[in-house]
Design a protein with these regions (language model features):
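Surface-exposed, interaction-prone regions used to assemble/regulate multi-protein complexes
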Residues: 1-182
Length: 182
C-alpha cells in the first residue's frame, strides 16, 4: 500500500522554496509543538500541513492509516493561532533553501518471507540557513503532527513514528526511512 503526497501537494510545497520563514503556527499548536494542523508562514505566503486518517487495506485487513497533506490556510486559522499565542518565530527570516519528504518503507515478513510493503510519506523538512524544521507524523494510524527544530538533519534525529504492526513468532517487520529532496 502506498500513502504518499500527490504531485499537486509536492508542487504546493515547492511554492515556498527560496522564501523567508516568518513563523510556524496552528490554531491548536501549543508549546509542545504537536497538533493535527500546522501553518508554515513565509514573508509572501501561507501553507498548511495537515494530518488526517483514512481507511486503508493492507493484505486484506481494513485499518485506519494516517496521512500528511498540504492544504490551504484560512484567515480564521491564522486568527485563532494568533489569539491563542500559537505562533512560533524561531528561525524567523531564514531562507527555505531545500525541502525534503520523509518517507518510510515498512516491510512485513511472515516466516522469513516478505508478505507486504507499506510506503508512506510521514513528514516534510525545511532546510534553513542555520538548521532545519521538521513536521512529522507521530504515528502511522493517527493524525497528530510534531514540529521539531534540528541543527543537523539525519533520519535518526527525527521523531520515531509509532505503529500497530504486530511481531510474533512467525511475523516481524523492518523499517527503512529516507529523505527525498523535492
Amino acid at each position: 500500500m502506498d500513502n504518499m503526497l500527490t504531485l499537486d501537494q509536492v508542487t504546493e510545497l515547492r511554492s515556498i522554496l527560496n522564501q523567508r520563514l516568518a513563523f510556524i503556527a496552528g490554531p491548536n499548536l501549543s508549546s509542545d509543538l504537536c497538533s493535527d494542523f500546522v501553518i508554515i508562514a513565509t514573508a509572501d505566503d501561507f501553507l498548511g500541513v495537515q494530518g488526517d486518517v483514512h481507511q486503508g487495506h493492507l493484505e486484506g485487513f481494513s485499518e485506519l492509516y494516517s496521512s500528511i497533506e498540504t492544504c490551504k490556510v484560512e484567515k480564521e486559522d491564522l486568527e485563532e493561532a494568533r489569539k491563542h499565542g500559537n505562533q512560533y518565530f524561531f528561525k524567523k527570516g531564514e531562507i527555505i533553501s531545500r525541502i525534503f519528504l520523509v518517507r518510510d518503507r515498512v516491510q512485513g515478513f511472515v516466516d522469513g518471507k516478505e508478505a507486504w510493503t507499506y510506503n508512506s510519506d510521514i513528514g516534510i523538512v525545511l532546510k534553513l540557513e542555520s538548521g532545519h524544521v521538521a513536521i512529522t507524523r507521530l504515528g502511522y494510524h493517527d493524525e497528530m503532527l510534531k514540529v521539531t527544530y534540528l541543527d543537523e538533519l539525519s533520519v535518526e534525529n527525527l521523531p520515531a513514528t509509532t505503529g500497530r504492526f504486530e511481531v510474533d513468532v512467525h511475523s516481524n517487520y523492518s523499517l527503512t526511512r529516507s529523505l527525498i529532496s523535492v
